[in-house]
Amino acid sequence: GDVYKRQMIDQATIDRILDAAQIVEVVSDFVTLRKRGVNYVGLCPFHNEKTPSFSVSPSKGLCKCFSCGKGGNAVHFIMEHEQMSYPEALRYLAKKYNIEIKERELTNEEKEVQSNRESMFIVNNFARDYFQNILKNHIDGRSIGLAYFRQRGFRDDIIDKFQLGFSTEGRDALAQEALRKGFKQEFLVKTGLCYETDDHKLRDRFWGRVMFPVHTLSGKVVAFGGRVLSTENKKLAKYVNSPESEIYHKSNELYGIYFAKQAIVKQDRCFLVEGYTDVISMHQSGVENVVASSGTSLTPGQIRLIHRFTNNITVLYDGDMA
């Protein structure tokens, strides 16, 4: 819904949506319900079960599975079932119940924040495409980057799926190409793809590395990780990651969550591994319900993210990784 980009749903409208949404009707779109006493029961849509333990209470306006614990009001149900954000679920219900959404205009400050965020995502998309192109079509990309991924045993379809790339040895190759294409220096710096030197030169943060884009839950590129391949220069950090930014808060993101969320719901379990390549290797061997916290222990924000899909987290750190 790009139509809604610049607006917010006001509280009065939210209240009207919540009042109108009949929990039994909302759940019935997805679950076959039978009346039992004052409530309704059905098979839980969030885990596999033979005996109905999913209960819906019209009087309370709530649903709950007594086996897996998932549930809540109509909005929570739609968020969980359709993997929607809170505003998306509200819009879904507004549409179902023909409620017109009166949206307040954003303040100029809010508009600026939003257009900054959009510009940053656009720059990140450009960088992802740029790194992917180098991996496939540039001589170093193929002989160094692609060779490394092939040596790890990664298939081409997996390399494409995770949008892997390569950055050349040039210290400002990305910066120059981006400026030439009309991207603003401001956003190259804000995303952390580039930085300014003391004498005001624009330099790339990532060079001579294989590149791993980090995706949000909805598949947008928020950050990058780059791994150095040459071993001669011992001073180089093995991994370089995007710095925190307006769009990237490391403690709220998990590598691979976008590619894993459906499998996590289906298997009702999430495997947590250490690094990017562990996630990719497991996908390639058919295990898709896997994410990486990139070496750090799980933050409360990351745990909340996983808990949107399952309560079961299994940690597979070095030693367990076959």
Where are the language model's segments positioned?
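Short, conserved phosphate-binding/catalytic loop or strand-edge motifs used
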Residues: G61-L62, K95-I99, T107, L146-Q151, ...
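Non-catalytic interaction/clamp surfaces of large macromolecular machines
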Residues: K111, S115-D160
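Phosphate/diphosphate-binding loops
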Residues: D318-A322
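Positively charged, low-complexity/disordered segments
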Residues: G1-D2
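N-terminal structured subdomain of primase-like DNA metabolism proteins
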Residues: K5-K111
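Phosphate-handling DNA/RNA-contact segment within nucleic-acid enzymes
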Residues: I9, A21, R36, E112-I122, ...
